[in-house]
Every structure is written in structure tokens, then in C-alpha cells.
């Protein structure tokens, strides 16, 4: 995802192989690409086992939800980046001027652009799903079949945006003057824009389209999550406490009006309730003595106790339903927070790349005028997009209790099998 080409100097002797080429490659690796190589290696070591574990747990252990589909899609894109593009990136970095494999380069760069574009479109789908769930809870919600359609559309869009990489990228010639020896150049080959595209505007157009697309998606993501955050804060400070109390009061009120169950006293107290007329007090006492041994009286007691028990069970069920609603809402907020952090990491990891592309578009000689340290930092920043592919499992682990527990259970099972 970089273009570090140089203009062809005037050389009468060109060295295309041998010890000079290998020495120059080693020197360039040590002075410019070593930080990028170490960074990519770390991302590979974190991302490969992390994404494999995430994919297994969400595929085999998680219940089917829209969030599960989206996370599986993101993880699949990240896994391909980690398993395929990162090893290829390491190969290019360690043999930067000795990588003469045009076809491999084309597919390598194409897959990189495709996976990153796919992730951005899936994250856009996630933001829309979260927005509908939190800001428009009464509207029809996305279901698993809808989330699969979103993932399919994201895949198609990623192909549409990435296909120019198959044409533009390939083997590029890099002439390197030999210090102290005039008119002698080492001719290197690397994986960048092909030579015949360097004098055209196609690479610039490709970068501008990707940059504009990235900015549009970022604006959409920021807008969605800003509205979500506003709604969560609004409910947390004003609506949530009152609505919670109202829900409890509604349950109690409903229970109190259901045959006045909360006003029921013990059966004997209910029966001994005095009548308002004083002259009927003797008759009441007499009727009481008569009914104490009556079978109807026993049946009445059983009926009333059964009714009271049912009402109490109903009250408990409605209280539990309120708690269940609150628990589900809390879980939804936690899931949204986790997916927001994944989105934030994705956006942040692409900021250095976008900035460098903008600078490079405005000043074509920017890279050539940098010192060796500057070139090292430049190439390191260009590969910051790998952060998103490798660190997403870390976010899932730190922000999802259930995921952590599933990981513990998974490793316990492995440990038990070894024993």
C-alpha cells in the first residue's frame, strides 16, 4: 500500500544481480524497513492466534444474532489479512529490491485492499444496525438474514473498489546509484505500481477514490455513533431512571388492580372484617360460628390462598421481566461499546495512511527528500492499518465477559485433553 518509486538516474552500467544487489538490499532493510518488519511480525503473532480463536468461539459457541454475523465477517477479513497479506508483506520488506514476482504482487495488493475495504463496509453496516436498535427501537430491526445480506454487499463493494490494484500493481524497477561510483547503478525490483503506470494519473486517481471513500465512510460512522452516544447519555441521565421507576410502578399498579391482590389480608382477617352496621355485629358473629365448620368455608380458604399465590407469582414474573429488559438493554449498550471501539481502532489505524497519501499526492518528491529515519517512519506509518486486523481480538477479550469465559473454557479443554 505504498509507492516509494524513484526516478531513473543516468547510468551507463546497471547491476541487476550478485553481491552488490544483495548488499544494497540488506543495507536498505536495516536502515529503512527494519521497524516495519518488526511491527508487522508483532501484528502477525498477535493476529493469527487471536483471530482464529475469535472465529472459533463466535462460530461454534455463540448464539445466532446479527452481531455474531458481523463479528464473524470482520474476523474473516482480519484472518485473511493476518494469514496471507502479512507474511507477504514480510517477504517484500525483507527483499524489498529483490522481489521480482509481478503476479504474486498483484494478488497480494489486491487482497489487502479488498479485505480492508470489506471491513470498512461491514463496520458501516454495524453502525447502522446499532443506530436502529438504540435510536429507533420501535422500528423493524435487522435480523440475521439482513446482516448476511449486508456482509454480501460489503464483499461486492470491496471487490469493486479493490479491482484496480490487479492492474496497477506489479513489478517496479528501482535504480539505486552506487555511492562513489559514477554512472553505476544497482537495479532493484519490488512490488509497487508497475513502471508503465508511473507516468500516468491512474495511481493518483486510485488513491483519491480510496481516500474519498474512506472519508465518506468515516463521516457516516462518526455521525451514527455520535447520535447513539447522545441517545445513550440522554437515556442515562433523564429517561432511564424515570422509565425504570415507571416500569416498576406499572408492574405494582397492575398487580394492585388485579383483584386488589396487594390489599388482600390473610384469609381469616379478610373474613373477620367488621361490617359497617353495628346492629349486624351479632348476626355476623353468629354466621361466623356457623361457617367455621362448613365445608364451603374450607373450599373458600383454599381458593383464596391459591388465588393469592398465583397473584404473587405473577408479580414476581413481572418484576423479573423488568429486570430482564434492563439486563438486555445493558448488554446491548456493552455490545455497542465494544463494536464502537473496534470501529474507532479501524478509523485510527488508517489515519496515518490517509495523511501520507494526501501529502504524497500534493508533493511527489516528498519521500525522496526524507532522511533514512524519515523513510523508516514513513513506511512504518503506512502499515499502521494492520493494527485493526490484529488488535480486534484484544478488544473482544477486554470488553466481553462471555468471550473471556469462553476462552478460559477453551484452554481448559485443551489442557485436559493433553493430560
Regions found by a protein language model. Name each.
Residues 139-159:
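The cytoplasmic-loop to transmembrane-helix boundary for the fourth helix
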Residues 337, 343-358, 377-419:
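Seventh transmembrane helix
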Residues 42-45, 73-76, 87, 107, ...:
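Hydrophobic residues within alpha-helical transmembrane segments
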Residues 1-49:
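Extracellular N-terminal segment of 7TM GPCRs
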Residues 177-189, 229-326:
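Intrinsically disordered, low-complexity cytoplasmic regulatory segments of eukaryotic proteins
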Residues 18-25, 99-109, 161-215, 220:
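Loop architecture of class A 7-transmembrane GPCRs
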Residues 29-41, 66-128, 133-143:
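Extracellular TM2-ECL1-early TM3 structural module of rhodopsin-like
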Residues 122-134, 166-176, 208-244, 338-360, ...:
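Class A (rhodopsin-like) GPCR signature focused on the TM5-ICL3 interface and adjacent 7TM helical core
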Amino acid at each position: 500500500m505504498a509507492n516509494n518509486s524513484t526516478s531513473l538516474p543516468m547510468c551507463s552500467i546497471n547491476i541487476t544481480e550478485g553481491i552488490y544487489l544483495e548488499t544494497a538490499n540488506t543495507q536498505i532493510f536495516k536502515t529503512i524497513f527494519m521497524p516495519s518488519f518488526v511491527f508487522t511480525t508483532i501484528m502477525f503473532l498477535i493476529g493469527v492466534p487471536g483471530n482464529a480463536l475469535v472465529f472459533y468461539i463466535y462460530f461454534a459457541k455463540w448464539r445466532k444474532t446479527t452481531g455474531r454475523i458481523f463479528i464473524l465477517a470482520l474476523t474473516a477479513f482480519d484472518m485473511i489479512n493476518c494469514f496471507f497479506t502479512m507474511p507477504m508483506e514480510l517477504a517484500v520488506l525483507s527483499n524489498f529490491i529483490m522481489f521480482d514476482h509481478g503476479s504474486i504482487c498483484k494478488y497480494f495488493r489486491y487482497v489487502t485492499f479488498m479485505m480492508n475495504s470489506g471491513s470498512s463496509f461491514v463496520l458501516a453496516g454495524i453502525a447502522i444496525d446499532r443506530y436502529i436498535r438504540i435510536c429507533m427501537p420501535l422500528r423493524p430491526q435487522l435480523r440475521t438474514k439482513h446482516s448476511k445480506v449486508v456482509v454480501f454487499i460489503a464483499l461486492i463493494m470491496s471487490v469493486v473498489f479493490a479491482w484496480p490494484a490487479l492492474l496497477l500493481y506489479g513489478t517496479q524497477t528501482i535504480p539505486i546509484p552506487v555511492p562513489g561510483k559514477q554512472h553505476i547503478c544497482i537495479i532493484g525490483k519490488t512490488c509497487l505500481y508497475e513502471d508503465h503506470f508511473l507516468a500516468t494519473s491512474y495511481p493518483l486517481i486510485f488513491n483519491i477514490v480510496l481516500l474519498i471513500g474512506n472519508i465518506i465512510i468515516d463521516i457516516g460512522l462518526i455521525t451514527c455513533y455520535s447520535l447513539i452516544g447522545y441517545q445513550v447519555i440522554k437515556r442515562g441521565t433523564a429517561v432511564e431512571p424515570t422509565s425504570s421507576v415507571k416500569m416498576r410502578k406499572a408492574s405494582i399498579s397492575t398487580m394492585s388492580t388485579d383483584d386488589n391482590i396487594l390489599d388482600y389480608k390473610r384469609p381469616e382477617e379478610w373474613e373477620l372484617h367488621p361490617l359497617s352496621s353495628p346492629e349486624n355485629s351479632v348476626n355476623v358473629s353468629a354466621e361466623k360460628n356457623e361457617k367455621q365448620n362448613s365445608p364451603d368455608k374450607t373450599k373458600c380458604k383454599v381458593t383464596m390462598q391459591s388465588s393469592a399465590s398465583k397473584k404473587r407469582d405473577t408479580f414476581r414474573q413481572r418484576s423479573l421481566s423488568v429486570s430482564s429488559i434492563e439486563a438486555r438493554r445493558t448488554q446491548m449498550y456493552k455490545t455497542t461499546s465494544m463494536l464502537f471501539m473496534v470501529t474507532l481502532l479501524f478509523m485510527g489505524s488508517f489515519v496515518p495512511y490517509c495523511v501520507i497519501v494526501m501529502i504524497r499526492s500534493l508533493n511527489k518528491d516528498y519521500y525522496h527528500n526524507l532522511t533514512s529515519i524519515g523513510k523508516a517512519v514513513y513506511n512504518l506509518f503506512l502499515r499502521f492499518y494492520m493494527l485493526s486486523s490484529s488488535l480486534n481480538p484484544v478488544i473482544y477479550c477486554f470488553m466481553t465477559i462471555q468471550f473471556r469465559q469462553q476462552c478460559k473454557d477453551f484452554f481448559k479443554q485443551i489442557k485436559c485433553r493433553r493430560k
